[in-house]
Amino acid sequence: MANHKSTQKSIRQDQKRNLINKSRKSNVKTFLKRVTLAINAGDKKVASEALSAAHSKLAKAANKGIYKLNTVSRKVSRLSRKIKQLEDKI
């Protein structure tokens, strides 16, 4: 247990932030899963729309410091490449 009021407060703040960050990360993962499911189903239009929504969520998460910018870029790039491969197959 923390001995100082300031450390007690910082522990409370950390716990609060941890819950918020978990929620935001979960929300982003849900959007990424929608893109992946659309890609696996072979539906290019739905996948593109889902990617645009997921990209927005990822950018906001990066802005909040939940994900690093390179991580977001990598995720978007990989999903975009998979959608592009769907176009090539058709």
From Swiss-Prot:
The keyword Cytoplasm does not apply. Keywords: Ribonucleoprotein, Ribosomal protein, RNA-binding, rRNA-binding. GO terms for cellular component: small ribosomal subunit. Residues 1-25 are annotated as: Disordered. Coiled coil: none annotated. One of its GO terms (molecular function) is small ribosomal subunit rRNA binding. Residues 1-10 have a biased composition (Polar residues). InterPro entries: Ribosomal_bS20 (IPR002583), Ribosomal_bS20_sf (IPR036510). It comes from the Bacteria. GO terms for biological process: translation. Binds directly to 16S ribosomal RNA. Belongs to the bacterial ribosomal protein bS20 family. This is Small ribosomal subunit protein bS20. It comes from Orientia tsutsugamushi (strain Ikeda) (Rickettsia tsutsugamushi).
